[in-house]
């Protein structure tokens, strides 16, 4: 199982050719389970499309790729023969949502207000740096994500904004004090993922084990935010073998 940004690829960019070929080989031997705070569409852009276009991954191989979006609160798997497909060609419509645990409108509003007000309190609400059409706080259905510079900011700017995580740790701490029923975890380069308490990556990994009928000892996890407060840390706490990259 893998985190995505800073683990498989540079933040917010598609996986490189070398990684696409490596994952293609792994799909012949293992069940591959990326788990991230990203929304489903980003999994397609950053991973699936690259596997198909660069590494010529087949629908049969994709049946072994399990996408756990929004920290694992959404799970998608590929059905090669769905929609009258004979299984010989890839069709994006054949991704099936197995489950989803969406936030209510009221929960989204509470989290959004807590993140925005906390960032403004400490001077880290940088709306003036957004590109046209971009936003700092994004509703990802089962999760709300704060991206300090927006989704469209350049990679260099993102890396430079909070390399030691101190800005986001402070925002997350303040937001948690405002709405204690929710969790706030640092992720990626400029992000904070917010969700109901307990619906972190350990929730996703537990569902992964249930869906694939495997035990903790069967899993090897790769991630970059394995420190306390990072969004990979709950996996470490579960006792799953973890490699920090």
What are these regions (language model features)?
Residues 124-220, 231:
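Conserved acidic, metal-coordinating active-site core of Asp-based
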Residues 1-2, 18-30, 178, 211, ...:
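A short, Lys/Arg-enriched amphipathic alpha-helix followed by its capping loop at the start of a domain
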Residues 1-5, 69-73, 78-80, 140-141, ...:
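Short loop/turn segments at strand-loop or loop-helix junctions that form parts
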Residues 14-133:
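Active-site phosphate-binding/coordination module
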Residues 36-38, 205, 223:
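Conserved phosphate-coupling serine/threonine residues in phosphotransfer and NTP-handling enzymes
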Residues 1-13, 34, 67, 205, ...:
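Asp-based phosphoryl-transfer active-site loop
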Residues 210-216, 227-245:
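Asp-based, Mg2+/Mn2+-dependent phosphohydrolase catalytic module
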């Amino acid at each position: 199982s893998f985190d995505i940004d800073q683990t498989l690829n540079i933040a917010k960019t598609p996986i490189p050719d070398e990684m696409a070929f490596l994952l293609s080989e792994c799909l012949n031997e293992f069940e591959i389970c990326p788990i991230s705070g990203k929304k489903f569409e980003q999994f397609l852009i950053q991973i699936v499309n690259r596997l198909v276009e660069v590494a010529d991954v087949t629908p049969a191989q994709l049946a072994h790729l399990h996408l756990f979006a929004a920290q694992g609160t959404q799970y998608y798997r590929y059905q090669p023969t769905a929609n009258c497909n004979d299984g010989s060609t890839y069709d994006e419509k054949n991704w099936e949502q197995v489950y989803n645990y969406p936030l209510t409108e009221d929960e989204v509003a509470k989290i959004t207000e807590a993140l925005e007000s906390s960032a403004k309190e400490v001077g880290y609400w940088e709306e003036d740096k957004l590109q046209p059409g971009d936003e700092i706080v994004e509703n990802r259905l089962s999760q709300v994500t704060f991206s300090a510079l927006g989704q469209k900011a350049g990679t260099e700017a993102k890396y430079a904004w909070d390399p030691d995580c101190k800005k986001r740790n402070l925002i997350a701490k303040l937001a948690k004090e405002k709405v204690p029923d929710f969790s706030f975890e640092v992720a990626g380069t400029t992000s904070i993922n917010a969700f109901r308490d307990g619906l972190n990556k350990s929730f996703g990994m537990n569902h992964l084990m249930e869906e694939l009928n495997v035990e903790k000892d069967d899993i090897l996890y790769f991630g970059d935010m394995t420190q306390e407060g990072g969004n990979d840390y709950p996996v470490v706490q579960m006792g799953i073998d973890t490699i920090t990259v």
